[in-house]
């Protein structure tokens, strides 16, 4: 990449960063409360944006968080980091103000007593420049990933067919 695009800056994909955050937080929740994995509605309530929850799920989540103060602390920390990571279209000056807050949150993750949160903190720290660039630049490779997914589905459906021209035609129809 550096050879062909010497001035290019790598920007982390917001979808993957948020997915990583959710994945490691859910691992920590399940480490604290192993019975949680059998309560699917509760897991969904902890994963879903609070603005998108029904009143019933919101109440269920709040009751659970009152019973589990450690999980509640991690959950509210995750929400704070999530809100910070979801910011878009920031100027360079605004980004400069947000960086210390981001680094402070990452440092507290690295000092966590839970291994999965430590790992998340180390990962975010290693990718800090790419993650911070998300606030300023919003272009990503989501379209390319979508096309690759469609192409894999076509291949799966057409397993055993040998006509490459037919495959190429299907890809052109579905991806244009």
Question: How would you describe each model-predicted region?
Answer:
Residues 1-9, 15-18, 37-176:
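Acidic/histidine-rich catalytic cores and adjacent linkers
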Residues 17-38:
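Short alpha-helix plus adjacent loop in nuclease-associated cores
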